[in-house]
A protein has these predicted regions:
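Secondary-structure transition/turn motif
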Residues: 106-113, 179
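Nucleotide phosphate-binding/pyrophosphate-handling subdomain across enzymes
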Residues: 117-223
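Short, intrinsically disordered, charge-balanced linker/junction segments flanking boundaries
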Residues: 1, 5, 231-234
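Flexible active-site lid/hinge loop adjacent to a nucleotide/diphosphate
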Residues: 2-88, 99-101, 106, 117-124
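Short, polar loop motifs at secondary-structure junctions
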Residues: 69-73, 90-93, 230-233
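Short internal beta-strands
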Residues: 65-69, 201-202, 221-230
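Beta-strand->loop->alpha-helix junctions that form or flank phosphate-binding loops
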Residues: 82-100, 151-155, 165, 227-228
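Short coil/turn connectors at secondary-structure junctions
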Residues: 2-6, 24-27, 61-62, 81-83, ...
Length: 234
């Protein structure tokens, strides 16, 4: 890595807690959402949120914080941010940041507003993927990417392995792998992305989360549910 290189890192709550010890936070911090996770280790949601706030705790006025305006908890973070706050939303315009307008993504930063058309051509299903695109676009712009290049990459991106990854189609049935959805909330986002009822295979280890909302989403979006793993009976 060169001294002027840009490194993109996904940090867990455990790693963010360690940032507090060395009194460091990223120059550009991105928060996509907040929902219960790793409560088997953190004990409660307050401790989990405190760990997550390590990503902004040691920022300065020269740094940036990119927050999801569609997440009520993250909207409350603004008053604690020391860096410049930019927002993104898949549901409404924001005063500065990235948002949706018709079939376009709007990048509105530093008094300049640019429409990036073609959202209908995005290859990833679900509102949560639009939110991820907006977050990444905002961070890329702040890191020096040009707006036309951002739009080109959005249209070309087909997703990552294990994240609503299209596997294959057999006899008219499409198979998707979303095994990276390790919380009820991420699984809800995935099954909500499909227009037709799904046959869902789900299960795994217990991290202390409630499955009530997940069960409600299954009733709404799944035709059949096959449960496996340690949480199958829960």
């Amino acid at each position: 890595i060169k001294p002027d290189g840009i490194v993109v890192v996904e940090l867990s709550s455990f790693q963010l807690a360690e940032l507090r010890n060395i009194k460091k936070s990223p120059h550009i911090s991105v928060l996509t959402n907040l929902s219960p996770n790793h409560l088997d280790r953190h004990g409660d949601m307050d401790d989990y949120i405190y760990a997550k706030k390590g990503i902004i705790a040691h920022q300065t006025l020269a740094d940036y914080t990119i927050l999801n305006y569609d997440d009520p908890e993250l909207r409350r973070w603004e008053r604690e941010c020391k860096g410049r706050v930019l927002w993104y939303s898949a549901r409404q315009p924001v005063r500065e940041g990235v948002f949706i307008k018709g079939n376009s993504m709007v990048i509105a930063i530093d008094g300049v507003s640019t429409d990036v058309p073609g959202l209908s051509e995005v290859k990833l299903p679900g509102v949560h993927n639009l939110q991820n695109i907006f977050a990444a676009s905002c961070a890329a712009y702040l890191a020096g990417a040009r707006r036309p290049h951002i739009g080109k990459e959005i249209m070309a991106f087909t997703g990552l392995e294990h994240r609503l990854e299209f596997v294959r189609e057999v006899a008219g049935v499409q198979y998707f792998n979303d095994s990276k959805a390790t919380t009820p909330e991420s699984a809800i986002a995935a099954i909500s992305a499909f227009q037709s009822p799904v046959i869902l295979i789900a299960g795994g280890s217990d991290k202390g989360s409630s499955f009530e909302a997940f069960a409600e989403a299954c009733v709404k979006h799944a035709r059949s549910v096959i449960l496996i793993g340690k949480t199958a009976q829960k």
